[in-house]
Amino acid sequence: MNSGEKQDNLQAWGQQPSSSYSNTQQQHGQITGQIPLTITNQVEAHDNDFHMQDASNDELEKSKKIAEQPTEHPQQHHQQQPAVPRFPPQSRQPQAILRFPQPPITSINKANNSNSQNFFPQQEVLQSRPKKHRVSMTNAEAANTPGMPPEKLPAKKLSADSQRPLFRDSNVFQRSAGQFTNDNGPSSSSAIVGAPFDANSSSKPVHIQQFRNPNDAPVTKLTSDLIKTYKAINEKFQSFYLRKNVRRSTVGRHTSLDSSGKPKTGKEASSSDANLIETFSIHNAVPNTSSSGNQPHYDSHVNAPPLLDTNAPPTSTMVVPMRTETESQQQMRQKSSRGGPYNNGYDDQNYDYILKNGEIFDKRYVILSDTPVGKGSFGQVTKAYDTVTKEEVAIKIIKNKKTFFDQAQIEIHLLELTNAHDKDNKYNIVTLKGHFVHRAHLCLVFELLSYNLYDLLKNTNFRGVSLNLARKFAQQLGKTLLFLSSPELSIIHCDLKPENVLLVNAKRSQIRVIDFGSSCQTGHRIYQYIQSRFYRSPEVLLGIAYDTKIDMWSLGCILVEMHTGEPLFAGSSEVDQMMKIVEVLGMPPKEMLDIGPKTHKYFDKTEDGIYYCKKTRDGYRHTYKAPGARKLHEILGVTSGGPGGRRLGEPGHSVEDYSKFKDLIKRMLNFDPKQRILRTTLFPVSHTAYNQNLYHQQQIDQVPAVGSVYIEDNGMYRPVPTSSHPISVTSSFDDGDVIEIDPNRRRYSQQNYHNPNYQYSQQPQSSSQQQQQQYQQSQRAQLEKQQQLQQQQQQQQQQRQHLSHQPSQSVQQHSSSSSRSRPRQQDQAEWRTQLELEEAFKQRKAEEATAPRSLQYNPQQVVGVQLIKRVLISKLFQGSMSHGNVNAGSSRDMEKHDYPNNKL
């Protein structure tokens, strides 16, 4: 075989399709009698040489897809194609049209270098595909370009059938793009595209069909790339939330999960825990110049992974890897008996400290239980034993997060301030014994108390406590608010509710106010969202500036709930809360609504400036009643024997008692903070120096008696009568477990019940209290002397007025002097009736123009109606001198009998 025939065979071999590349290589070895071509060991060198040429990345991907073809092609593709005339021998160019780039043939090593010149006599190195396509070349350029047909055929419009791919078998594109194997070994990463080669007609060229892979279309390729990208992002999302759910569901232990989200067991879990797996989280990208205040943990807690920063501004969302646990941290966590995910195993997923029985805090406090006695958003409270003071205490362990740490520091400052002004603990505020930091947790040490008022309601099956016990709670809480609102403190509790009022003893009614974490001072208000929803005041709901009066609103809600057993305003949201308030108290004042920044949230305004309740989204006003339709009178059951009639017939629950309780609640729940009761307190018989000085500063002559509510309303102090039972007297009740027992006090006897001058047995008094009593007695003696002088002057004036015939002037002077001489502890209604009777008697006496007679009472001298009038006048004067009570009922009966036509 000469060199010309060999060249023709090589030209036909180059026109074969890539699917029959291995068979073609064997046939070519048989024809030429040479050793088959071998491929270099470095397949990557082909790609490097290929990238050095002008081929683009897209063309490289196409060549790799063509290489993914099976070793043995189906037989129907090897059918012989019709013969076509050959090109002139002088051109010596292959007729195959190359649709995809080929690696340079220079990278193929020949087994016999001496025979390589026989195959390519005119070219030393066969060039790769031309830089220009044949369509864009002229015939002259194609003639000078190796590997290109000399004549340019006219372009023909292909039909839809001709554009279909040649290989429709799906297995053609399922091979990997790394290499192509055959019987002789690995093949090249790319192949020559052409028609199948027939051994019988090896010297005849075949017709080549053009095809295009539809998967390589630009739109299809872009879509597939986007799908891959989003799929990768979703996988990273899933891995992050999967890890987050594991932290939430696992308390005090580590659980390994497989790809499906189920927990692993055995060797899989141990191997997965040993390997560090990097997870991803989606968070808002913030600048690196953020301050340390945005860090989620306390400054010493640096080992935990970062949290999601919800306060960061929304800039751009990106996927970043989270910090993984180091080997030292993992070993320390495994050695820890707690096994928590944070703080070297000492914190759980909620950043609460994992308690362990018998652990010692601050070298003196021994933890007494693994479970806390109370838990909240701030942290948890546990019971401990103080080895120094030999007493049990309560330790409040704050969460290991910076926000709670800063809030607890404010609570420490306010408690130290209140304890410094109340060293004797007279104002019912919890005592702070100390504070320290334990394993990055701020701990506060308090006195150990009993359960709270909400637990007390649960013990009564939410039937409520009696008015007597509610009055005792009101006395103590009012005293606390009076102390907190003093100018030296000016503290707003901001979270007064039954859960924050604790009993000192389960069998006593003495209480303590706790949880000053949300508190602030009047001039340093730092929170906008304060107070629990059921006890939130209207000014806070409307966004108006608030002061200490918001605690008085909360106190009114607490007192109603303690007696009825249910919250007065149980709103599910702020809008629902405002509507519940409007149902009972009516519409808020227009002045408040005009200045409220959040008024539009609850009310709409007409063109005339009238506010009305805002409609809901569905167009209806929900199921709310009209403003003021739900009466407080009916809620308390003033005339029906209490809430639901449960207190009907019980002592201390009369209509009069409920009426006074309702009036007190209405003054506490006034919309306008300026008209709301500032301070309310109930004072016992033995008064402290603080209260006594307060009375003298307000020019009050006499301290109110037992059972009176002392109210400061806009700076004016005045006594208001309460229920018939004094508050300081011990009493038992069957509606709860709280019983006040004091062996040093005597029970209230029925015979001395109406005697205001009766002195009950009291505990030994100190020197300061004795001085106060002496001062009080001296003041009373001076007052009696003044009253005697005034009466003498009145008698002299009456005689002069009778002689000068000026009755009207005498009546006015006598009424004014009588009003000044009246003791302050008498009932106002009885007082008013007696003054009117006295004025009527004096007026009729002046009209009779009789001489003044003796005012001494002698039953034997009572003759006729005129003597009965003088007896009444003498009794009135004697009552004013002795500061005693006057029997109003008998006086009214005598007045009716004597003067049937009198309108009084």
From Swiss-Prot:
InterPro entries, per database record: Kinase-like_dom_sf, PKc_DYR1A/1B, Prot_kinase_dom, Protein_kinase_ATP_BS, Ser/Thr_kinase_AS, Ser_Thr_dual-spec_kinase
SMART domains xref list: S_TKc
Location in the cell: Nucleus
Cofactor(s) recorded in Swiss-Prot or TrEMBL: Mg(2+)
Family, as annotated: Belongs to the protein kinase superfamily. CMGC Ser/Thr protein kinase family. MNB/DYRK subfamily.
Keywords, comma-separated and alphabetical: ATP-binding, Kinase, Magnesium, Nucleotide-binding, Nucleus, Serine/threonine-protein kinase, Transferase, Tyrosine-protein kinase
Protein's job: Possible role in the function of olfactory neurons.
Ranges of residues in domain Protein kinase: 367-690
Enzyme Commission number: 2.7.12.1
Biased composition (Polar residues): 9-23, 286-297, 721-733, 881-890
Region Disordered: start-end pairs: 1-151, 250-272, 285-345, 717-830, 881-904
The name this protein goes by in its record: Dual specificity tyrosine-phosphorylation-regulated kinase mbk-1
Active site: D495 (proton acceptor)
Any one GO biological process: positive regulation of DNA-templated transcription
One of the record's GO cellular component terms: nucleus
Pfam families, alphabetized: Pkinase
Record: residues binding ATP: V373, G374, K375, G376, S377, F378, G379, Q380, V381, K396
Low complexity composition bias: residue spans: 24-35, 112-123, 749-820
Keyword Nucleus: yes
Primary residence: nucleus
Comp. bias (Basic and acidic residues): 59-75, 892-904
Catalytic activity, reaction form: L-seryl-[protein] + ATP = O-phospho-L-seryl-[protein] + ADP + H(+); L-threonyl-[protein] + ATP = O-phospho-L-threonyl-[protein] + ADP + H(+); L-tyrosyl-[protein] + ATP = O-phospho-L-tyrosyl-[protein] + ADP + H(+)
Cleaved signal peptide residues: none
GO molecular function, one term: protein serine/threonine/tyrosine kinase activity
CDD domains: PKc_DYRK1
